[in-house]
Amino acid sequence: YLETGKYNPRPSIQTIANAMDVGDPSNFARILDLYGCSWENIKSDISGVTYSDAQIGETLASTFKTENYLLDPHGAVGYRAISECLADDEVGICLETAHPAKFKETVDSLTGGDVAIPERLKAFMDGEKKSVQMLPSFREFKDFLMRE
């Protein structure tokens, strides 16, 4: 979309940065609304890149080795994009929203390490998953929240 202005949803392609494996993002309509459905406005503020699992893994491993900083796979994508795409006079900020231990198997295999899992994350990961099926209705959602 960013290159052509044409939105072509497609099946997701699985990668080690699984939150970025979205071929038909549910929030795309919100982005269009924010930018008045203008491709020109969107592409003036937003750019995009794609990386293979090998590139993501290389970034994660090399950053750990050279900077002693442990990225998660999603952070590795953002960090690589900033490293490759910023102009010399630009400053970038890379924020991660997940602890690398959430991707322990992947991170351990790429770094040769053993990521420690923080107690709060362990308790969350070991906790019981709770879900409730409901219709895609605001009224039903609101009623559920008011009951709980």
Residue ranges and their predicted role:
Residues 1-148:
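PLP-dependent amino-acid enzyme catalytic core
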